[in-house]
Curated annotation (Swiss-Prot):
Pfam family, one: Conotoxin
Location, primary (coarse class): secreted
Organism whose genome encodes this protein: Conus textile (Cloth-of-gold cone)
Domain note: The cysteine framework is III (CC-C-C-CC). Classified in the M-1 branch, since 1 residue stands between the fourth and the fifth cysteine residues.
Name the UniProt record assigns to this protein: TxMLKM-021
Similarity comment: family membership: Belongs to the conotoxin M superfamily.
Record keywords: Amidation, Disulfide bond, Secreted, Signal, Toxin
Length: 71
């Protein structure tokens, strides 16, 4: 009787929990699908616009978020 209870518990509780897709996984998948739909010109435009928005580092402290500007 105990073995039957364990088998029922596994199939009725644990197996459905293991096969459920988590809601947290779905936005990441949608984001990846949306990125794949971009053509190469759109990707290039996004990258170039991001590179143009860099600013000079204050007080000469250069790091990856800004460019070292002399003058």
């Amino acid at each position: 009787m105990l073995k039957m209870g364990v088998v029922l518990f596994i199939f009725l509780v644990l197996f459905p929990l293991a096969t459920l897709q988590l809601d947290a996984d779905q936005p990441v998948e949608r984001y990846a699908e949306n990125k794949q739909l971009l053509n190469t010109d759109e990707r290039r435009e996004i990258i170039l616009s991001a590179l143009r928005t860099r600013v000079c580092c204050p007080f000469g402290g250069c790091h990856e978020l800004c460019q070292c500007c002399e003058g």
